[in-house]
Structure formats: structure tokens, C-alpha cells
Amino acid sequence: VARGSGQWAAFRLPWRPGQPQNAFVIVKANPSVHVYVSDRSHTGTLTLADTGETRAAKQLEDHDASQLVVKWAAKPFQYRSVCFAVGPETRAFAPDKATDGWLRPYGGPHMWVSEPLAGAAQSPWLQLEWDREQTVGEIRIVFNDDVNKDLINLHHHRTPFEIMPELVKDYRIEAWVDGQWEVVARERDNRKRRRVHRLRRPVRTGRLRLVVESTNGSPAAEVVEIRVYAP
């Protein structure tokens, strides 16, 4: 690493798993090197700190056995993440993740994440397409509400936001009808994880897409699942 600040330090990982899965990268302390920490967390990743202690607090349990799970703490990096970049380009957030049947992280993230909304030429969209036209009567969408949040019911415990930033805020659903996109559903100021849109008039279409207009704070659109049903 060359002397100086604000630079990237590249290194190769010799690990090549047989199938996509989570990876744990341990960065050990070095008095001559510092890592940058961003002011926001990154979906699909966790940043933990080594506490050096493997025993749970005595007042929490009747026993004091060594527990490796308490060795790594998330609290020091709550709502933050170490700055890093990966290459080549990952498919961990590819569009097909929104139709793989998983609603929670398992062996990796299971959601579609768009490119950043800021500066984009057009609103990001997620499209479903069939070999032949279908009659669509209901669309169900599951957005990301980030399961990695420290939330309890004590009144003094507050988050820096009132609505989960990762939730999509404004969006519309369009169907390809007679050679053009037709809006069949629209939502404003969304703050829910799961949305169900029952169409007043079922529509015949071979293509359907979810167009994200804004989020509640996240730089990108994040969609866990989208399902389409007949009337």
C-alpha cells in the first residue's frame, strides 16, 4: 500500500466456492493502516467488530459458556459499513433474484437491487415477460425493509429515520397493451414491506413491469419479490 490517504488497496481472494454463498472477510488491525467507514450500510453486507470476548454477560443467562457468536458485535457499525468494492461484477442482486422464491436472506441476498437512482436517465424498472399473453388480476410485491435493524419497544430507543430507508416510496405498475405501456396500478408514499394490488379490470398482457420512482432514502430500488396472479 502506497503512503497517503483516500486510496484503494486491492487484493485477490483465492477462494472459489462451488456455488454462490456468503463470504466472511476478516481485516486485522494494523497501526499503519486505516479503513474508511461510510455513513450508511450496504444491503446484503454486515460489518462487525471483534470484541475479543466470547462470553455473554452473566446477567443475561444462567451459564457462562464460551459463545463465539458474541465475539463479533454489530453495534459499533450500526447503519454504517466499511468502504469496499468487489470485482468482477456480482450477480448477487440480479433481476431474477426477485422470482427465486426466497423472502429472506439465506446463503446470500435474495432481492433485486437497481443501479443508483441519482443521475439515472430514467426510473429503474423490473420486468416480467411470458411466452404468451396472460390474464393478470393481482400483483403482489415484497420490498426490502432491512431485517438488520436494532428495534425494540422502549420509548427512549429511536432510529435516525421514521420509515425504513430501503422501502420503495413511489412506484407504478405498467402492462404492455396494444403496443404501449399502460399504467394499471400506482402507489405514493409507501411505507409497507408487502403490497397487494388487485386490478379493477383484469388485463391481458405478455409483459408487466414495476417502475420505481423514488425510495424512502435508499440510493437504489430494492425489491425482494414480485408475483402475478390470474383473477
What are the residue ranges of the model-derived segments?
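Helix N-cap / beta->alpha transition motif
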Residues: 1, 12-14, 95-108
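A general structural signal for short secondary-structure boundary/capping elements
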Residues: 17, 72-73, 191
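Aromatic, loop-rich ligand-recognition surfaces of beta-strand-rich domains
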Residues: 31-57, 102-183, 189-231
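PGST-rich, cysteine-poor low-complexity/disordered linker and tail segments that act as flexible spacers
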Residues: 42-104, 118-119
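Short beta-strand segments enriched for Tyr within beta-sheet-rich domains
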Residues: 21-26, 136
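Surface-exposed, short loops/turns at beta-strand junctions within beta-sandwich domains
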Residues: 15-19, 201-204
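Surface-exposed turn/loop modules enriched in turn-prone residues
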Residues: 1-17, 27-28, 165-180
